[in-house]
Amino acid sequence: MPAEKTHLAICNLTKEQYPQIKTLMDQAYPGLGGAWPSHTIFRLIDQFPEGQIGIVDDGVLVGIALSVQVDYGRFSNPHTYEDIVDGHDRVFSDPEGDALYGLDVVISSTHRGMRLGRRLYDARKELCRQYNLRAILAGGRIPRYYNHSAEMTPMEYIEKVDHKELYDPILSFQLSNDFQVKRLLKK
């Protein structure tokens, strides 16, 4: 879709947008269970509304970024995904937290290649400045690692992606947004 024909705006997600959120997540994660249940998204919106960011194109949701506030001391150290998200049923957010934890970024397949993910990350960075948060933390999948798992370790794969010898849609995106890999998370 040509950029000059779009009417994009950043917004905070609302509960009324859940059907559109569900559609985006179902498209992005068909093999991983699809969208989180409505009560989980509603809890995120209730607990930390500013951290649930969307991009709309002429009123249609085309991208989302979900986040929670966490304690930097706890989550900058080894932890598991389940320490943040309990089976997509409960998400733990700490209103006194001093860091932002990025849970997810999803862009509609019709709007990829328009740097919307970067716009969502920029909105997260601005939120950190506004709240004087210490950092953005995130755990990310390396979805194309399975193609190379017989010939290299996950850390070797990460190094090759970092040196642009390999491309991984999630890790390459995070690295291009100035994130640094600190460690591998256990399942």
Feature-to-residue mapping (PLM):
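Short amphipathic alpha-helix that is part of the acyltransferase structural core
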Residues: 1-43, 47-76
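Conserved acyl-donor/pantetheine-binding loop and adjacent beta-alpha core of acyl/acetyltransferases
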Residues: 65-104, 122, 138, 142-167, ...
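Short amphipathic alpha-helices and their capping/turn segments at secondary-structure boundaries
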Residues: 57, 87-92, 122-133
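Conserved acetyl-CoA-binding loop-helix of GNAT-fold acetyltransferases
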Residues: 107, 113-129, 135-138
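Short alpha-helix
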Residues: 167-177
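Conserved acetyl-CoA-binding loop of GNAT-fold acetyltransferases
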Residues: 30, 133, 175-184
